[in-house]
UniProtKB/Swiss-Prot annotation:
Cytoplasm found in the keyword field: no
This protein's record includes keyword Cell inner membrane: yes
Organism per entry: Hahella chejuensis (strain KCTC 2396)
Biased composition (Basic and acidic residues): 122-136
GO BP term, pick one: protein transport by the Tat complex
UniProt-recorded name of the protein: Sec-independent protein translocase protein TatB
Gene name, Swiss-Prot/TrEMBL: tatB
Start-end of Polar residues biased regions: 99-115
Record's subcellular location: Cell inner membrane
Amino acid sequence: MFDIGFPELALVAVIGLLVLGPERLPYAARKTGLWVGRIRRMVSQMSSEIDRQLKAEEMRERLRKEGDTLGLEKIQQTVNEALAEAKKYEDMVEKNPATPMSSKASTPQTPSSGPDPQPVESHSHSDDASKQHDRS
């Protein structure tokens, strides 16, 4: 990232030793390492975020182009025209309500049932015998 070679690093170490002294140099090196690590992480996060945003913008642009080729604008115009026509008919219906039909025509008629069906009588053998007896 910074393209620092060994000679440059050695020069920085010697200057740091002269300026800070042998007691504070390890502490300063540790703190410097922590800060460099934090900076690298931040740069990496920012770089990945920028990449994600660029990819998202590419996708939006591609979708926009695909939408143009599919004629979405034409479809949207057709839908809007249909909605306007439906609104016109709705206004006509609200201005001129239909006259109500007579109550007899508006209510559905149920089929009339004739007389209630009577149960069928079953003939038992004893009834047959009594009828034959009556005939004689």
